[in-house]
A protein has these predicted regions:
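Hydrophobic alpha-helical connector segments
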Residues: 39, 50-79, 132-135
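Short amphipathic alpha-helical segment with a characteristic S/N-K-E followed by hydrophobic residues
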Residues: 9, 32-37, 47-48
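Short hydrophobic/aromatic patch on the recognition helix
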Residues: 20-30
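Short, amphipathic alpha-helix enriched in basic
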Residues: 1-18
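Amphipathic alpha-helical segments used for helix-helix packing
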Residues: 72-99, 180
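C-terminal peripheral helix-coil segments that are non-catalytic and often amphipathic
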Residues: 111-119, 151-181
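Amphipathic alpha-helical packing segments from all-alpha helical-bundle domains
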Residues: 94-121, 129-144
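Residue-level detection of the helix-turn-helix DNA-binding "recognition helix"
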Residues: 17, 31-32, 42
Length: 181
């Protein structure tokens, strides 16, 4: 419900009705809307992590993993109301959770980038620690930027992810990128 309609429009009454439980029961399980949202976001995050594991197991190299994940993110962005992401940031517990997840993702991405170097697909002369710290890499923030939000998610990701990957890729990596484009 929240992903389809945004956070503001969905009331606890709506959630109770959708789940076929009383509002009292819902409030026994969740103290308030923020606590419910935090649990919703945790479930979404667990599904995303499971998807990442499947991608890693089914791909031949790190660039393939990145592109498969990229496709998954684009699909998710098309299915979710952009207001969902924007409105979530008004809830401190959810924001804290996202900050923790962002640190975990940065660690995972660093591992992927190092693996790409070992596979000869990414340049070895880049300080990936510095690269990951730059605000430009925080792609998730692009989706809540009102100036950027007017563009479809695929355009945003193509304009940012592909450009970054091309800059990081070796000649061998560029050949793989061309195949996925």
């Amino acid at each position: 419900m929240f992903q389809a309609q945004g956070v503001k429009l969905v009331r606890m009454d709506d959630v109770a009705r959708e789940l076929s439980v009383s509002k009292k029961t819902l409030y026994e399980l969740f103290a308030d809307k923020e606590e419910l949202l935090l649990e919703v976001v945790k479930v979404i995050s667990m599904g995303f992590h499971q998807n990442i594991k499947e991608i890693i197991c089914s791909s031949a190299n790190v660039l393939e993993q990145i592109f498969m994940l990229y496709k998954r993110v684009i699909k998710h962005c098309r299915e979710v109301n952009p207001l969902f992401f924007i409105e979530l940031m008004r809830y401190p517990q959810v924001q804290t959770f996202f900050e923790q997840v962002h640190v975990q993702h940065a660690d995972r991405i660093k591992e992927w980038l190092q693996m790409g170097v070992k596979q000869g697909l990414l340049r070895d002369d880049v300080n990936y620690e510095v690269f990951l710290r730059q605000d430009g890499f925080q792609i998730d923030k692009l989706l809540i930027n009102p100036e950027v939000r007017k563009y479809p998610a695929k355009v945003i990701y193509d304009s940012v992810v592909l450009v970054m990957l091309r800059g990081l890729a070796t000649d061998k990596g560029l050949e793989i990128i061309k195949q996925w484009k």
